[in-house]
From Swiss-Prot:
Keyword annotations of the record: Apicoplast, Plastid, Ribonucleoprotein, Ribosomal protein, RNA-binding, rRNA-binding
SMART domains in the cross-refs: Ribosomal_L14 (SM01374)
GO terms for MF: large ribosomal subunit rRNA binding; structural constituent of ribosome
Ribosomal protein among keywords: yes
Annotated protein name in UniProt: Large ribosomal subunit protein uL14c
The keyword rRNA-binding appears for this protein: yes
Family classification: Belongs to the universal ribosomal protein uL14 family.
Organism encoding this protein: Toxoplasma gondii
GO-annotated cellular components: apicoplast; mitochondrial large ribosomal subunit
Domain of life according to the entry: Eukaryota
Localization per Swiss-Prot or TrEMBL: Plastid, Apicoplast
UniProt subunit comment: Part of the 50S ribosomal subunit.
Length: 121
């Protein structure tokens, strides 16, 4: 779990590099867990991005630095907090997803996100 008001790296090819989380939309809590949807502000972009600095976006949390028990006997620790940018209808804004994707996220109802995934733990 991670708290709100923290930075998340974006792991898709939208051109956004880093966002700052404002609100947890999935549940009314200041803690953020994987599979949560957050509201964030863009803090860092690449120079050819179609997004603007300080634009408000939605993000689907994929990876956290906190130790997670994804399967019953394995614990996973990632190096960064990462999100995938989505729109209001939960469709991904990018066309590719970079990095590892935990297996417990495959079981959710986000079929369009699951179809873009290449590396599954």
């Amino acid at each position: 779990m991670t708290q709100l008001n923290s930075f998340f790296y974006v792991s898709d090819n939208t051109g956004v590099k880093k966002i700052f989380s404002i609100q947890n939309i999935t549940r009314n809590s200041f803690l953020v867990n994987t599979t949560d949807i957050i509201l964030g502000i863009i803090k860092e972009i690449s120079f050819k991005s179609s997004f603007k600095y300080s634009e408000i976006v939605y993000g689907f949390v994929v990876r956290l630095k906190k130790t997670q028990n994804i399967q019953n006997r394995y614990n996973y620790i990632f190096n960064e907090n990462a999100v995938i940018l989505i729109d209001k209808n939960f469709n991904p804004l990018g066309t590719r997803i970079f990095g590892l994707f935990p297996e417990n996220l495959k079981n959710n109802n986000y079929l369009k996100l699951n179809s873009l995934v290449l590396n599954i733990i």
